[in-house]
């Protein structure tokens, strides 16, 4: 049996561009992709913190160091410049390996500056 597990996450990045007429995708700073282990053309899910939209597309690289997050094509109708996003990729792992799997999680401030990288989501307390 395979389990679908979180592989990489960009937590609370800010949309810097939304281009309805660009070929579909989400362009992101290559440094961001490297931190989360997201590959170019990999399927990603995007969760818009500001409006609750959830959608799928694929990743493409933007210039390294640019801090760009550009939502393109039809997806541009689901995210506006300034919106905060959570961008995730997933991997299928054999059941026996799933309990030991650790995702790559990059956390950002409001200016798309990476503040830390982690291998787990903090435990939620009451």
Swiss-Prot record:
Is synthesized initially as an inactive proenzyme, which is activated by self-cleavage at a specific serine bond to produce a beta-subunit with a hydroxyl group at its C-terminus and an alpha-subunit with a pyruvoyl group at its N-terminus. Keywords: Autocatalytic cleavage, Cytoplasm, Decarboxylase, Lyase, Pantothenate biosynthesis, Pyruvate, Schiff base, Zymogen. InterPro entries: Asp_de-COase-like_dom_sf, Asp_decarbox. It catalyses: L-aspartate + H(+) = beta-alanine + CO2. Binds 1 pyruvoyl group covalently per subunit. The keyword Cytoplasm applies. GO terms for cellular component: cytosol. GO terms for molecular function: aspartate 1-decarboxylase activity. Substrate binds at residues 57, 73-75. Pathway: Cofactor biosynthesis; (R)-pantothenate biosynthesis; beta-alanine from L-aspartate: step 1/1. SUPFAM superfamilies: ADC-like. It is an enzyme of class 4 (lyase). The active site is at 25 (schiff-base intermediate with substrate), 58 (proton donor). It is found in: Cytoplasm. GO terms for biological process: alanine biosynthetic process; pantothenate biosynthetic process. Its cofactor is pyruvate. The modification Pyruvic acid (Ser) is found at residue 25. Its EC number is 4.1.1.11. The keyword Lyase applies. Catalyzes the pyruvoyl-dependent decarboxylation of aspartate to produce beta-alanine. Belongs to the PanD family. PANTHER family: ASPARTATE 1-DECARBOXYLASE. Heterooctamer of four alpha and four beta subunits. NCBIfam families: panD (TIGR00223). This is Aspartate 1-decarboxylase. It comes from Photorhabdus laumondii subsp. laumondii (strain DSM 15139 / CIP 105565 / TT01). The lineage of its organism: Bacteria, Pseudomonadati, Pseudomonadota, Gammaproteobacteria, Enterobacterales.
């Amino acid at each position: 049996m395979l389990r679908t597990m979180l592989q990489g996450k960009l937590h609370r990045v800010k949309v810097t561009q939304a281009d309805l007429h660009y070929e579909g995708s989400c362009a992101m700073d290559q440094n961001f992709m490297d931190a989360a282990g997201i590959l170019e053309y990999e399927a990603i899910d995007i969760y818009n913190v500001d409006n609750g939209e959830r959608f799928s597309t694929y990743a493409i690289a933007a210039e390294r160091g640019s801090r760009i997050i550009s939502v393109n094509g039809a997806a541009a109708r689901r995210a506006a410049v300034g919106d905060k996003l959570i961008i995730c990729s997933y991997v299928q792992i054999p059941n026996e390996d799933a309990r030991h799997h650790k995702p790559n999680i990059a956390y950002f401030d409001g200016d798309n500056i990476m503040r830390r990288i982690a291998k787990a989501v903090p435990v939620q307390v009451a």
